[in-house]
UniProtKB/Swiss-Prot annotation:
GO terms for molecular function: UDP-N-acetyl-D-glucosamine:N-acetylmuramoyl-L-alanyl-D-glutamyl-meso-2,6-diaminopimelyl-D-alanyl-D-alanine-diphosphoundecaprenol 4-beta-N-acetylglucosaminlytransferase activity; undecaprenyldiphospho-muramoylpentapeptide beta-N-acetylglucosaminyltransferase activity. It holds the Pfam family Glyco_transf_28. HAMAP family: MurG. It comes from Synechococcus sp. (strain RCC307). This is UDP-N-acetylglucosamine--N-acetylmuramyl-(pentapeptide) pyrophosphoryl-undecaprenol N-acetylglucosamine transferase. Pathway: Cell wall biogenesis; peptidoglycan biosynthesis.
Length: 360
């Protein structure tokens, strides 16, 4: 039975696409997982796949500090090399992040094919440094290829959890009514500024008959300040796939995972990129979506500025006023999301890994 080693660690953006690929591998394959101690994979992976861990850090800072971190990453490749040989792994797949560098180097030392998946429009530092050592660099967005030299890029899209691909009923706690449903996804980082923009714009929309579901995140000092029968606020929901499928419009950050989930659900979006994202990659992700007519972009601004309020009125106003559906801007955005969506990214990556293992 051939074995796949998956190296993915840290955040949902790295783990969920990797889990989708693991679940898509044929039953004739066995999966092993490489992670870092005390990270999210300790909660998500062991019940499904054998988990092995090594210590690996990032590449922050400059000069001697960065050189020291690079040496530590290289040193981490040795235990991964032993793991690949002991487990007899035929191919290695990684979704980037800290764990990717030792996994890529170990695969090369063991002469195993390795695929690195880059989900963002601007590749991360590890992808830019180590992508040239990979058999393929799989891309979630084609714009990333412009930043990679000496690599073998292949556009596959970014896999999403199966829940996003299955029709689901609208949760019963969503405010009832005939008005358009606006879904706000604050995200796990930098949500306070976005939440304040939304709360400033919400009263006028609610007065016109709009319904709002606001997932404000777990760090929100203003939570509970806005009350209205058509406004439902929660820190988080496990039912995001169903919410996206039933929302008429979403307001979201522009992380690659969120963008892929919006796309496969066909949900029109106002994207507010997180201003402190590394290399401003969320702005590049948002631009990629806007380029195919899938979303509009609003830069984060103070709650008293009119940018988001005006955009929401432009998008929701025609529906709230009962205008001709043919002139509804949300219809055009939904068509754009259909163009952006790659619903079989997990299958494409699974097949790529099998093909490379067969050629090795």
């Amino acid at each position: 039975m051939p074995r796949l080693l998956i190296a993915a660690s840290g955040t949902g953006g790295h783990l969920f696409p990797a889990l989708a690929v693991a679940d898509r591998m044929p039953e004739t394959w066995s999966v092993r997982w490489l992670g870092v101690p005390d990270r999210l994979e300790r909660q998500l992976v062991p019940s499904r796949y054998p988990l092995f861990t090594v210590r690996a850090g990032g590449l922050q800072g400059r000069g001697l500090r960065k050189l020291k971190q690079l040496i530590q990453l290289l040193w981490s490749a040795w235990p991964v090399t032993r793991l690949i040989r002991k487990q007899e792994c035929a191919v290695v797949f990684t979704t980037g992040g800290y764990i990717a560098a030792p996994a890529i180097l170990a695969a090369r030392l063991c002469r195993r094919p390795v695929v690195l998946h880059e989900s963002n429009a601007i590749p991360g530092q590890v992808t830019r440094l180590f992508g040239r050592f990979c058999s393929r660099v799989a891309l979630g967005l084609p714009q990333a290829a412009d930043y990679l030299s000496g690599c073998r890029p292949e556009v596959t899209g970014t896999p999403v959890r199966e829940d996003f691909l299955k029709p689901a009923a609208c949760p019963d706690w969503v405010p009832a009514g005939d008005g358009p449903l606006l879904l706000v996804i604050g995200g796990s980082q930098g949500a306070v500024g976005l939440n304040r923009m939304v709360r400033a714009a919400a009263p006028a929309l609610l007065a016109m008959g709009c319904r709002i579901v606001h997932l404000s995140g777990h760090v929100d000092p203003d939570q509970g300040q806005l009350e209205h029968p058509a406004y439902s606020e929660r820190p988080f929901s496990e039912e995001i796939p169903a919410l996206l499928q039933h929302a008429d419009l979403a307001i979201s950050r522009a992380g690659a995972g969120s963008l892929s989930e919006l796309a496969v659900c066909g949900t029109p979006a106002v994207l507010v990129p997180f201003p402190q994202a590394a290399d401003d990659h969320q702005s590049a992700n948002a631009a990629a979506a806007a380029a195919v007519g899938a979303a509009v972009i609003v830069a984060q601004h103070g709650p008293n500025e009119p940018g988001l309020r005006r955009m929401l009125w432009n998008l929701l106003g025609p529906r709230l006023r009962g205008c001709d559906p043919a002139a509804d801007p949300l219809r055009l955005l939904r068509q754009g999301m259909e163009r952006l969506a790659v619903r079989d990214a997990d299958r494409l990556l699974s097949q790529l890994l099998q093909d490379l293992a067969a050629e090795a």
